[in-house]
Amino acid sequence: MSLNLSKISPLILLFTAVMLLSGSVFSSAADIPFVRGDANTDGVVNLSDGIWLLQYLFLSTPEGECAAARDFNSDGQVDLADALGVISFRLLDGAPPAHPYPYCGDSSIGECASYPICPPVPDVQVNRDELGVWFIEGGSIFDLYEAFGYEVAVDRLWQAEYFRRLCRGRLAEIYGVDQAQTDISIRLLGYSDEEYLAGFENISERAKELVLGYIAGFNRRIEELGADPTDLPFEFTDFGFFPEPWTVVDVMALQVTLLRNFDSEALSTHQLDNAVLLAELEDEHPQDALAMFDDLRWLDDPDAPTMIPPTTPFQGLQSAQGLPTPVAGQYQVENLRLLRDRAHEVFEGTRDRLQGIGTPLRMGSYAWVVGGDLTDSGNPIIYAGPQMGFTAPAIIVEGSLRGAGIDVSGMAVPGLPGMIIGRTPRHAWSGQVAHAHTVDLYLDAVEDISLHRIETIPLGKDQFFNLPVYRSVHGPVISPIVISTENLEGPVVTWKYSHWGNELRTVDVNLDMVMARNLQEFSSAMDEFSVSLHVCYADRRQNIAYWMAGLDPVRVPGADPRLPQLGDGSMEWTQPVTYKPRKTVTNPSRGWIGGWNNKAGSGEAGGANPNHAYGKFHRAHAMQDRLTSAVAEGPLDFEFVRDLALEVSATDCCDLGKNGGNKWFFVSESFTEAVEADLTPERLEALQLLESWDGYFVEGGEEAWVSSTVNSDAWELQDRWIRRVLELVFEDELETETLTWRRQGENLLFNILLRGLPGSDLTLQNSINWFENRSSVAKPSDPFELIVWALDDTLASLGPRPWDMDRATIDYQADSLGVVWSAPWLDRSTYAQVVEVGPEGPTRIESMIPLGQSGAIYVNGQDPEFDPQYFGFTEIFDGFLHRDFPVFHESPQD
């Protein structure tokens, strides 16, 4: 090969010159296996390998005997891309070599006759800090994750067992027939064992290794307990069984079922609920039914706060006229309510049953990331606060993995082999439940379904139930539960999920997120992430970014997304299936990104789900307003970004998934004007109380926010007053057969109220006058008179001050033991991390988890005995005192 200097870039010439000055480097040959990317075969992948490849390509140096080692990108060829890949990897946060890396291993691509040296794999070392958090280092990827699985099993074997049984549909076997419907629901929506195993075969070789290692770690702990059951968790003794070995199917099922619980559409009956609502509105208000429905289930409110900063303000007013017109067949269905009720048993009923045994899974989360231009250090700072409910033990553990090319710390869920939210030496990320339209419920004909398999569900006491699982081309039949199609009258409801099949690769996607070396690689992982989540991001290149993950298929024109889809072929997803462009932003000019489960960006969002209610009022304002004000005053420090979480958590009470923010500030002018027009001493006193209110549901500042036992009188007044107004406004229109005003969502109705108040200049307008009295009971139709009426009712119900209403508590309930810990209620996250990312990686990390790292309860005679670390974090977490976590050049002892 001759060298043509005119065709070589200055960068290549530079490295070639360095190579010529340093001399050629060769090593003696040895047998394979090999390390990919180690072109000069010295046992490591570094800059000298890129230089060696340039010399080989352009100076005709000998090629050696291991082409696979030189083939950095594993495409079967050794070319300039491999040289540039090595250089980018070492200097520019480029992608690492393909497998096998960083240790020797075989490869199915490339040739390797001999290889000089295999670097020794370091032994796995596990250390724990004073709170029991584990730090695992060294080993191959199998070894690293074997230790990961083992340490999780030591801390959370019973909790992982519960998750396994939930996700495999085996709760009734130990909890009894009350959970049989839960098991039926899981089996209907899940994959067969064969499908889970096929999904495992389709993940990457590296992902397979870590899954198998994680399982081996769990099983090592189970074997230890089999030999010496002294530390067998109390619950196994209480329920009377010993844990079975873990399998691939267990992990695959767990990643699917648990993550669906954090997809706002995956496990819901919203489209069927909406169909019932529209049908009942037609029964009660035939002239106004569609207008009412459009007001109640809007698709786009341009005034709603968004994750992505708006660029161009919306001009003019917007009404519901642009909404799709429902096709009669989408809601005028025989036995519609029965179909809805049975589907409810599959979805919401499962949540209710899990709540009954103290293991609710909740959806929420706040997060924000501030760019370096706005911080006093010049570094981006990210806060991640996923809200997943409060159980005993908590749903998550914390730890650190460092080895086999993986370097990450953060939050993990027992039974899932990955860090769901965390940080690496290059980046940090968050996760919040989002609103990608991932599910359609189809009304299919009986002749279009077929038996897929029979699932055998153990009910305990040697009793079993054989469940037929039927599917159509759209997916599993969820309503009714079909035992036989003989004499079955349609339609049936089937569940079509955009993440079906893709979600089986979640372990690979999480690995890609962890191992991403730059923003582009992390973005590629977001393209494959099969959960509808808002994800904020910061990296050492000073980037901040946001994505809404989740696959939102393009639907055919005319199909109303708020309602069930017809299974007659007229409302199919486009073929081949295409997806709407992902909502994302990088380094916005505003300098920060953040929200609290709010709308991603402009355009339609969340119309099928009444819990979304993306309107002018959304709890995200509590965080966004404070950030906007703080930025205007000057650079933000680490403490402000961290402590903002406590502020927003104290704005409202007491529903983790729905409350938050300050409704009063959105109606204070209208409500005050109404009352001042007809003042009495009692009404004036109420206004004066609210005029001096600081906007938090507990008085007294930060210390009181975490410790006070009574609610603020002002908060109590405005909360009850607004609720009473909503009742008076909507009770007559929404007094339908099954869907009363109380089932519409308080935030949804509040936004409709805002649009209807006198003088409203909001972009989205109501189609009807909701203040009109449609009932037989006399009450005002004038908005101001009704507001005053509601105030009088509220004051009468409260009685004389001070009210000093008891503050709600967060109650941690453990299996069989009931409530084991309580703390004052805050609308807070289950996990918290705040990370400042400098040019060399994180410079400061703080975090906290509820209760403690361990969830182990042991048998001590007849009584349960809690592990010393079961309550290790309570002082930190209850006090909202984020604690220091080691950055990546520190050890847990530093």
Task: Explain the meaning of each model-derived region.
Residues 403-414, 422-427, 431-568:
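Glycine- and hydrophobic-rich flexible loops that cap the catalytic core of alpha/beta enzyme folds
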Residues 609-679, 771-894:
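Terminal end segments
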Residues 14-121:
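Cellulosome-associated attachment modules in secreted, modular CAZymes
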Residues 706-796:
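Charged, long alpha-helical assembly modules
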Residues 40, 72-74, 147, 193-209, ...:
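Second-shell loop/turn segments in exported
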Residues 2-13:
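Bacterial N-terminal signal peptides that target proteins for export
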Residues 439, 531-630, 726:
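Hydrophobic alpha-helical segments
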Residues 120-381, 386, 728:
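Substrate-recognition/specificity elements adjacent to catalytic centers across diverse enzyme folds
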